[in-house]
């Protein structure tokens, strides 16, 4: 789907995208760390995480408790016993350019207050494999684990023992003690060499068995076998590069520590790590490893820089989920050439049209690619890609790979520019519309105007309706939903609940392949379980534009009532009243001008209502000056923006008069004034309920439901009105449960500690947030103390 620049996101759009990114990245973490079957490349994953961080940086108050920026890896799989790491296995922040690598060196210097003194780093190739931790006691391997979520991993000791590179007993020490710490966790990477990977896949293909997409998947799948004998048959290797818990220090520098690891019997990275100095050294070693990369026997995806001095590492400490003293410099995304065979259009839930390139299959970075996003019509025109072109494909930046551009010298004769359709690809062929922003500029997105009449939008609405954060109906997956939609059994959300009581259809379903008594009974049970549901999930499930999960909760709490379907009827009535009082187009255009805030907007509207004479100040030199005479309190940036927008006095005066006539009514203003709603969400809600077909489908749905009101936050508790931060590991409740509990008690839950924070609840592993709270003199309590205070 097309992507709005972070700088252009509204708060509502940012909140909705952060919600989507949290879900998407959690799913990718699960596929990568547990299922060993990632569906996107590392470059794509890094791009998603970077966009998440960029949005959080711009909207820090929207940082979610389940933010990917707070998480490492994924929870352990249930088939393996849990292992708690003595020291968490953290991930590294990334750098993607020379400038970012240089800035890393500058940050280190600023923190350590160094000016001209040299800073030394170890630079190691970043192996693309599966992280593992090995615990040795008195030199003997006693336990091995995967990273898991960084805190809890999976016990794969027996499997790791089968890898020849892993010593069962450390070398070079006295068995009675000495030579190595009594207790130490060695960290490293399990990987497979490219030649061994290719040989395994070739043999598996010939035998009709499963093949793997890339060496990393193969290594992970081979290590995480229930039967260690299978792991023993796989060509697994291990590089050691770090350590976690240790009972005593054993080195003064990272460089010295790597030497000790080799002395104890481990293989460290090849090409070997190098010790470099200052920013230029970081850039030089990166260039060297990039040249050597194609010659290596295994995959590397970058270079890891670590401050060499361990005392400096200790002083630098950690930020969030990563060490301040290390960073991973990633190689650029890999590219390939292929043929653009066709351009298809996909229709989203809100009617947005996304062009998708259909490509001649090509392997990029070990993954076969057949599709790539083209974002929108403007992007196709800008890149001038045409059907039949040879194009350069890059796996980075989007969930589906992207086309960098065409190879013009290979363009076939007769290739013509792509003409973006004017009508939806559905059988109704409804016209596509291109909307305008509040400031009057056209958006890049084209939308199908058919709304619920469009079958593509209807199925996307249904998918959203049954999604995990909406109705989350167990037993009704996308495949079943699509089949029921095609047959006409489910055309709108209400049909789902009608199906559960349609004995004729259920009887027919029991006779079908893949169903039977048990699966149909489970489907009915899943549907019936959602007849009673909270108002917030109902609002979110409707799939209104600009109304994400957070906004749905705000609305549900504001309109909560024991009557009228949990408050839904009150919400609908308020939206319908507001629908007749929406601001006019010229009002929105005027209000969207740069420098025009709410006060300036109101002053302009009042001036327009009073009527402006035709150029009452002809002696003025410019329109900006005339506007200043007409509305004296306007700022200079606002005057300049309005003068550029309207050009002359008559056009400006006419716009002001129209804006005055199009000013919104009181009911709309009340809806928009709800804390957390605002004008964009208010307009979306009002426009949704203004449509007769929406009201009809909503009426059908709520007739099937018992909607429960969402409890309004209390105002008479010990924490009402206070800002609270939860940090560290919570042992008696999840972060979501803690947040819900605090908000229900009238508190505001924040993700970072500041002077405005009233209370920090700190669990095991609390780091920088606890330190900041202590420095600021903010009250800190344990999870048990919190529960005792709130009566949990």
UniProtKB/Swiss-Prot annotation:
Origin organism lineage: Bacteria, Pseudomonadati, Pseudomonadota, Alphaproteobacteria, Caulobacterales
PROSITE patterns associated with the record: BRCT, DNA_LIGASE_N1, DNA_LIGASE_N2
GO biological process: DNA repair; DNA replication
One GO molecular-function entry: DNA binding
Natural source organism: Caulobacter sp. (strain K31)
Keyword DNA repair: yes
Annotated binding of NAD(+), by residue: 42-46, 91-92, 124, 147, 189, 306, 330
Record's protein name: DNA ligase
The protein's Enzyme Commission number: 6.5.1.2
């Amino acid at each position: 789907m097309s992507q709005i620049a972070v700088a252009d996101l509204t708060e509502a759009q940012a909140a909705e995208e952060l919600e989507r990114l949290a879900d998407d990245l959690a799913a990718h973490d699960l596929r990568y760390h547990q299922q060993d079957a990632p569906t996107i490349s590392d470059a794509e994953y890094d791009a998603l995480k970077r966009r998440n961080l960029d949005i959080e940086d711009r909207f820090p108050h929207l940082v979610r408790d389940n933010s990917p920026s707070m998480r490492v890896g994924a929870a352990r799989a249930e088939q393996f016993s849990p292992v708690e790491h003595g020291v968490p296995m953290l991930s590294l922040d990334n750098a993607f350019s020379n400038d970012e690598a240089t800035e890393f060196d500058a940050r280190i210097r600023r923190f350590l207050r160094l000016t001209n003194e040299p800073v030394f780093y170890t630079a190691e190739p970043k192996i693309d494999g599966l992280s593992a931790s090995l615990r040795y006691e008195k030199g003997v391997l006693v336990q091995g684990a995967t990273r898991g979520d960084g805190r809890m991993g999976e016990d794969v000791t027996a499997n790791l023992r089968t890898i020849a590179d892993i010593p069962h007993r450390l070398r070079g020490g006295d068995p009675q003690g000495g030579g190595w710490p009594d207790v130490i966790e060695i960290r490293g990477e399990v990987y497979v060499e490219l030649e061994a990977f290719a040989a395994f896949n070739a043999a598996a293909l010939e035998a009709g068995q499963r093949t793997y997409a890339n060496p990393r998947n193969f290594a992970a799948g081979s290590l995480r076998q229930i039967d260690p004998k299978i792991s023993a048959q796989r060509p697994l290797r291990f590089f050691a590069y770090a350590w976690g818990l240790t009972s005593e220090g054993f080195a003064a520098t990272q460089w010295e520590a790597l030497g000790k690891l080799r002395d104890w019997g481990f293989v460290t990275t090849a090409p070997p790590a190098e010790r470099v100095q200052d920013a230029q050294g970081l850039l030089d070693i990166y260039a060297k490893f990039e040249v050597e990369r194609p010659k290596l026997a295994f995959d590397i995806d970058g270079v890891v820089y670590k401050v060499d001095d361990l005392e400096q590492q200790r002083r630098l400490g950690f930020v969030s989920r990563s060490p301040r003293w290390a960073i991973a410099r990633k190689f650029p995304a890999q590219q390939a050439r292929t043929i653009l065979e066709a351009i298809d259009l996909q229709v989203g839930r809100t009617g947005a049209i996304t062009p998708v390139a259909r490509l001649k299959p090509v392997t990029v970075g070990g993954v076969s690619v057949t599709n790539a996003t083209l974002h929108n019509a403007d992007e196709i025109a800008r890149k001038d890609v045409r059907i039949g072109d040879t194009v350069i494909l890059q796996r980075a930046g989007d969930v589906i790979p992207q086309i960098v551009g065409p190879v013009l010298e290979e363009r076939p004769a007769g290739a013509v520019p792509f003409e973006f359709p004017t009508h939806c690809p559905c059988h109704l062929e409804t016209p596509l519309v291109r909307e305008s922003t509040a400031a009057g500029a056209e958006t890049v997105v084209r939308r199908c105007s058919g709304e619920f009449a469009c079958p593509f939008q209807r199925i996307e609405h249904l998918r959203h309706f049954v999604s995990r954060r909406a109705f989350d109906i167990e037993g009704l997956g996308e495949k079943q939903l699509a089949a029921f939609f095609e047959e006409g059994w489910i055309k709108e959300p209400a049909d789902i609940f009608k199906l559960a009581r349609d004995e004729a259809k259920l009887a027919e379903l029991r006779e079908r392949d893949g169903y039977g008594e048990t699966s149909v009974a489970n489907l009915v049970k899943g549907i019936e379980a959602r007849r009673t549901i909270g108002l917030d999930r109902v609002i979110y499930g409707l799939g209104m534009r600009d109304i994400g999960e957070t906004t749905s909760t705000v609305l549900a709490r504001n309109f909560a009532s024991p009557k009228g379907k949990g408050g839904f009827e009150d919400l609908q009535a308020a939206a319908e009243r507001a629908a007749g009082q929406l601001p006019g187009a010229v009002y929105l255009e005027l209000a969207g001008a740069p420098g025009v805030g709410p006060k300036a907007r109101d002053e302009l509207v009042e001036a327009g209502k009073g009527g402006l004479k035709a150029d009452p100040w002809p002696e003025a030199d410019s329109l900006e000056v005339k506007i200043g005479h007409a509305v004296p309190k306007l700022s200079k940036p606002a005057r300049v923006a309005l003068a550029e927008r309207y050009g002359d006095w008559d056009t400006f005066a006419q716009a002001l008069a129209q804006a005055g006539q199009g000013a919104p009514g009181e009911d709309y203003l009340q809806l928009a004034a709800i804390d957390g709603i605002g004008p964009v969400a208010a307009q979306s809600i009002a426009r949704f309920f203004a449509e007769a077909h929406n009201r009809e489908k909503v009426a059908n749905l709520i007739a099937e439901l018992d909607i429960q009101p969402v409890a309004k936050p209390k105002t008479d508790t010990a924490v009402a009105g206070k800002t609270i931060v939860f940090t560290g590991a919570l042992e008696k409740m999840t972060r979501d449960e803690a947040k819900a509990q605090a908000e229900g008690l009238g508190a505001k839950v924040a993700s970072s500690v500041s002077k405005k924070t009233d209370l920090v609840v700190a669990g095991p592993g609390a780091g920088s947030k606890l330190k900041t709270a202590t420095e600021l003199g903010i009250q800190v309590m344990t999870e048990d103390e919190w529960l005792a205070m709130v009566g949990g």
